[in-house]
């Protein structure tokens, strides 16, 4: 994740690369669907930085997606797009 600031009080700096994680049921194909969802929302996904991991019991999957955001609005749009998916239970 690339977040740059010469002053830590500034928060996120744009443009930049950011990482989101979303968790949901393992049998729903979220590892493929969520990156496509962000692309459809106009978010620039870094395809080679998409990863996922199943829970120890195999019931859930955590999908980690790196994306580029030009502005805070674009960053918020990416979060909202994932949160709005009916199968996503949590986002980080």
Swiss-Prot record:
Cited SUPFAM superfamilies: YbeD/HP0495-like
A Pfam family recorded for this sequence: DUF493
Top-rank taxon, per record: Bacteria
InterPro entries for this protein: UPF0250_YbeD-like, YbeD-like_sf
NCBIfam families the record matches: PRK00907.1
Family note: Belongs to the UPF0250 family.
Protein name: UPF0250 protein Smlt4048
